[in-house]
Amino acid sequence: MSKKLVVIKGPLLTQSGYGVHCRQVFKWLISREDFDVKCIVTPWGKCSWILDPENSIIQEIMKRTVNDENQPFDISFQVQLPNEWNPFLAKQNIGVTAAVETNTCNPDWVECCNRMDKVIVPSTFTKKVLVNTGADENNIEVIHESYPETFDLDDNIEVLEFLDEIETKKNFLILGQITGGNVFSDRKNLFNTIKAFVEAYKDNKDVGLIFKTNLGRNTKIDKTKTISLVKSLVKEAGKGVFPKVHILHGELSEKQLKYLYSHEKVSYLLTATRGEGFGLPILEAASQGLPVIATNWSGHLDFMSLGSFTKLPFKLTEIHETRVDNKIFMKETKWAEVPTGSSGYFLKKHLITMVKTRKTLKICQLK
């Protein structure tokens, strides 16, 4: 049987959201017996590379990587921003993107979408963003991302000694890369979220915060800078001895992530995000029965609406001028802003309900 020559282009070897999405698409492509799959690897901002030869998927990507784009590809899957797509890379070209986490996108992206044979997005939210800006909705398909299959295996965990060393038995979990240099430009809204937590549980020795984060890389220098930044944020919030804030930095394996989400000391996942194209960590946490407190807007509603979660109220607000780059984030576009005080209110409210049975909250076992 003659196989089709298929290429996937994107940040396949990076520790990033797009990198994870790339590898999900790659796994599906190599499962097809009728595809001869090649890889064109690109960077993703300043994110770290994953070059672990013992990881079978990483090894397979490296083995299939090519440098020459001028090959007679039959199909291309380009997991990138729309302006990075090449509509002439193959005979049939499919763009895969989470676009941008605002209510509309760069108008130039509309033409980029219309030039591709098909566009795949991870959520109805992302599709709406593109369509609201003028893209052809008939050319855009929604295919959701997925949590790791290994999460469904009961014994598939790897102990994180970090958690065993934490003295607080009730902890909120925040995951996310710090994506902006100030409180106004950080898309994940981590600055305000940490402040709300510290203020809500000031002087409370029974509750802690586990903050899994970085500034873009999993290096020692990045860790030092990250710890320094978080300490300054906590200090600005007027923290005393309590609550305890625990910083978790560096790459985690799928087994370690499962251990983190399902650990008895982790009581809630908290995100006051301003916008998500999909929100994979939210799905991962929910798949393990971890209760979620999240902004009631953007990509994660596709799956969180299938069950129940604590919805943080929001107002659509124009993005701050320090976030505007007129390439990805456009002037006068809007994202969600959780009103001051809302996060703290819900944090205090849910201290009482931390004993909820996880089994009743497993809402996202998507097949």
Where are the regions a protein language model picked out?
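Extended catalytic core of nucleotide-activated donor transferases of GT-like folds
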Residues: 7-9, 46-131
